């Protein structure tokens, strides 16, 4: 997702600015005169393609600076003050360990209706009204859980339907979703697999865990995209450990919220979609 790539860029600029301010230096941020209106930036961002090259036309470069500047301002409100230095690993690790957080297990237990839902099979077309997944709680993983390679998710069995059937379900699902979700064929298949076959009878906690893992994979891809752009990867490595954790957790929740919204949308219309 290009949007997530720009979130990383913006938050890293913010974190770098804070670190530079702590050391008595000021990091240059793009001139506010080039910042476009918020709604214009929101409309433009999804339509752009990923460009890692420096050979970018002036008008496009100008547009991207505007978008990044807009995100910098938003990021400044969200990300906490950067830790003192990357080299001070023990202090940073200790600080991260003391920060209040919601681990995966705790978050799953506290999610509304999780216990009740886990005691009975998932709703089918003939069961009670679909119980959607709460979007009011978030995850915050500690440093030790981000300090390892995010393992690719085990392949889940996809619905055994023809490509034509998958395309039909995908097109119908896109129309049901809010415009900002825009699910892909792959994402539709992942959600479909939770409401068809053996997975539909698994408890709510299992479904949440699947969505968390899918969100982690999204973060992993975002980092790989950033790594492919040398200047952004260098900037990432200059930022404090604590700030990196904040950025990763913020991205995790951006993706996790999106997956939950898509899950709820599919679940509400599951019988109609699967019957296509």
UniProtKB/Swiss-Prot annotation:
Q: Where is this motif: RxLR-dEER?
A: 48-65
* Residues covered by region (Disordered): 97-130
Provide the Gene Ontology terms for cellular component. extracellular region; host cell nucleus
- Keyword terms of this UniProt record: Host nucleus, Secreted, Signal, Virulence
Keyword Signal attributed = yes
Where mainly located?
secreted
Localized where? Answer: Secreted; Host nucleus
Here the segments flagged for biased composition (Basic and acidic residues) are 101-119
Q: Which residues form the signal peptide?
A: 1-21
Query: What is the UniProt domain comment for this protein?
Result: The RxLR-dEER motif acts to carry the protein into the host cell cytoplasm through binding to cell surface phosphatidylinositol-3-phosphate.
Q: What does this protein do?
A: Secreted effector that completely suppresses the host cell death induced by cell death-inducing proteins.
Family membership, please give it.
Belongs to the RxLR effector family.
Q: What is this protein called?
A: Secreted RxLR effector protein 120
